[in-house]
Curated annotation (Swiss-Prot):
It is found in: Mitochondrion. Component of the mitochondrial ribosome large subunit (39S) which comprises a 16S rRNA and about 50 distinct proteins. GO terms for biological process: apoptotic process; translation. GO terms for molecular function: structural constituent of ribosome. Residues 1-13 form a transit peptide. Belongs to the mitochondrion-specific ribosomal protein mL41 family. InterPro entries: Ribosomal_mL41. The gene is mrpl41-a. It comes from the Eukaryota. This is Large ribosomal subunit protein mL41A. Component of the mitochondrial ribosome large subunit. Also involved in apoptosis and cell cycle. The keyword Ribonucleoprotein applies. One of its GO terms (cellular component) is ribonucleoprotein complex.
Amino acid sequence: MGLISKIARGLVRGADRMAECTSKQGPNSYNKGRGAKKIGYLTASGKFVKVREMVPVFVVPDLTGFKLKPYVSYKAPPGTEDPMTAKKLFMETVGPQIEKDLQEGTFRPEDLEKYGFEPTQEGKLFKLFPRNYIQ
């Protein structure tokens, strides 16, 4: 009966692997844990050895003289500025310079590096728009 009910539950609810095994369903020695990272290892004799390199270290910046508060109230008014779009960013950064060069007649499409265009992303840590560049 147990097998049929589990199959029926799988068909009705879908495959739910997280709810399958709990501490109530396992043996008394079963402890699922909370998903914390291990900071050491168990030896063959069952002794736990703590490894200093595996212990997480939290780096907290010095916030003396920092003006902003760490909490934003839910009663704070919503922002009045429109969300940033690619066109808006372009028009605020490079657009005026290109328009000025077009009016003066000095704009050359093959000299886009002057405006910050990068033809390749060699040496970059993060590749932006990888489909636009030749691999």
